[in-house]
Amino acid sequence: MSIVTKALNLVPMVVEQTSRGERAYDIYSRLLKERLIFLVGPIDDHMANVIVAQLLFLEADNPEKDISIYINSPGGVVTAGMAIYDTMQYIKPDVSTICVGQAASMGALLLASGAAGKRYALPNSRVMIHQPLGGFQGQATDIDIHAREILTLRSRLNEILAKHTGQSLETIARDTERDNFKSAVDAQAYGLVDHVLERRPEESIQPS
């Protein structure tokens, strides 16, 4: 049995009573009904497609109601992360982001790109920013092409972080030169999140 299959078998099921009897959901599908999306694990093309589809579905369902993305990710493929980022900016609903565990690399960029005033981190979560990583083998000309592409991506990622954090491009470039880890409080001070949540506000808990 593959690791993926084992992981899928561990997803809890939720059973609800309806007028037509019982209906079972996996926990993530049930939470999607509450407009909660989970971005968990490495960011790749498959994950990006799933997250983008969920965002577009929830926009179609109600374009006026906020969407929340819970992030616990070490980062991943830049282009996959940018697909999620562009969709978050494109759709009409505000997208709130919440860091649980860690938001590193592209995960940190997506955390910072939530709607202004609606970016959160839990108190013991960690955030890490750095420059994009890349490796390529081949002819010298091809290596040069890919090196220039990485520099282009780095410049664009720095622009996005500067836009959402309020830091200058020079500060972002300096601070992403190497892996730069931040606590939830430090991430708030830097502008990566707006609030550190100790407890959920009582008024935000709605009965199902």
From Swiss-Prot:
The biological process GO terms on file are: protein quality control for misfolded or incompletely synthesized proteins
- State the InterPro entries in the record: ClpP, ClpP/crotonase-like_dom_sf, ClpP/TepA, ClpP_His_AS, ClpP_Ser_AS
Any idea where this protein resides?
A: Cytoplasm
Which SUPFAM superfamilies does the UniProt entry name for this protein? ClpP/crotonase (SSF52096)
Q: Which Pfam families match?
A: CLP_protease
Where does this protein chiefly localize?
A: cytoplasm
On whether Lipoprotein is a keyword of this UniProt record, the answer is no
Write down any Gene Ontology CC term. endopeptidase Clp complex
Catalysed reaction(s) here are:
Hydrolysis of proteins to small peptides in the presence of ATP and magnesium. alpha-casein is the usual test substrate. In the absence of ATP, only oligopeptides shorter than five residues are hydrolyzed (such as succinyl-Leu-Tyr-|-NHMec, and Leu-Tyr-Leu-|-Tyr-Trp, in which cleavage of the -Tyr-|-Leu- and -Tyr-|-Trp bonds also occurs)
- The record's EC number reads 3.4.21.92
Q: Which keywords, in A-to-Z order, does the entry hold? A: Cytoplasm, Hydrolase, Protease, Serine protease
Query: Where, by residue number, is the active site?
Result: 105, 130
Q: Which residues form a coiled coil?
A: none
Which EC class heads this enzyme's classification?
hydrolase
The UniProt subunit note reads as follows:
Fourteen ClpP subunits assemble into 2 heptameric rings which stack back to back to give a disk-like structure with a central cavity, resembling the structure of eukaryotic proteasomes.
Q: Which family does it belong to?
A: Belongs to the peptidase S14 family.
Name the job this protein performs. Cleaves peptides in various proteins in a process that requires ATP hydrolysis. Has a chymotrypsin-like activity. Plays a major role in the degradation of misfolded proteins.
Question: What's the protein name?
Answer: ATP-dependent Clp protease proteolytic subunit
